[in-house]
């Protein structure tokens, strides 16, 4: 899988967005291996809105990574490691960041739902935080994070929800909130209704989202 992205920001650049390979045969074994560059499975960002949820803004982490996964009967477990853009001050530039992801999805009486959770050893490697952390990419310490998300589809209605937070605070000199180290978090709730208007599928959706201690990341405190 290879995907390029075109950005018309005045420079009209084309850059590599994703490039990875998956090794496995789901018909014979539930285990698989994925290697390359992509957004690691930290967070559930499905949405019917035209803008990304704040959880994605906070935590989407695209890295060159190696992932080992297991998927069977609706259960998925994944673990991955990567060498992030940020490093502990004084440490060697090596593969020492990692993440875990687990999810379950099923269908009951025509209704489908999914739940998932994840852990990331260093949320500083998310695109938003890396671009805004003060003092470059050398950190006093890694800042782990966790998240939970879910969805429910029943008839024409679809519901999404997610929560993500740093487990610890950043050093105040790296990412601050009210003159102290920030511990950014975000959540989103969304409801969508799928129908037809003039024989065309149409989705009507509403959302409520919020962030905490994310002023330094230029994230809105609330979004509707």
Q: What are these model-derived regions, one by one?
A:
Residues 91-92, 184:
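Interfacial loop-to-helix transition and helix-capping segments at the boundaries
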Residues 9, 54-56, 63, 90, ...:
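Short, flexible coil/linker segments at or flanking structured domains
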Residues 1-86, 94-99, 103-110, 114, ...:
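Outer membrane beta-barrel
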Residues 23-26, 107-224:
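Outer-membrane beta-barrel pore domains
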